[in-house]
UniProtKB/Swiss-Prot annotation:
Lineage: Bacteria, Bacillati, Bacillota, Bacilli, Lactobacillales
Gene Ontology molecular-function annotations: structural constituent of ribosome
Name of the protein in question: Large ribosomal subunit protein bL32
Organism: Ligilactobacillus salivarius (strain UCC118)
GO biological process: translation
Family: Belongs to the bacterial ribosomal protein bL32 family.
PANTHER family: 50S RIBOSOMAL PROTEIN L32, LARGE RIBOSOMAL SUBUNIT PROTEIN BL32
Database matches in Pfam families: Ribosomal_L32p
Highest taxon in the source lineage: Bacteria
GO cellular component: large ribosomal subunit
UniProt gene name: rpmF
Keywords for the protein's UniProt record, in alphabetical order: Ribonucleoprotein, Ribosomal protein
Amino acid sequence: MAVPARRTSKTRKRLRRTHYKLQVPGMSACPNCGELRKAHHVCPSCGYYGDKEVVKTK
């Protein structure tokens, strides 16, 4: 089995791990009602996706 020739320092290990983080989901304003919703998803408040009503809301 392959073994590293040198020990990885704490700094190098931590610098490599700086990119391991959670990403915030892309939010956009609904063109119909103006509420925030996830991009490319049906709006939970009005039920529209683009110009069409996909889900009936009360």
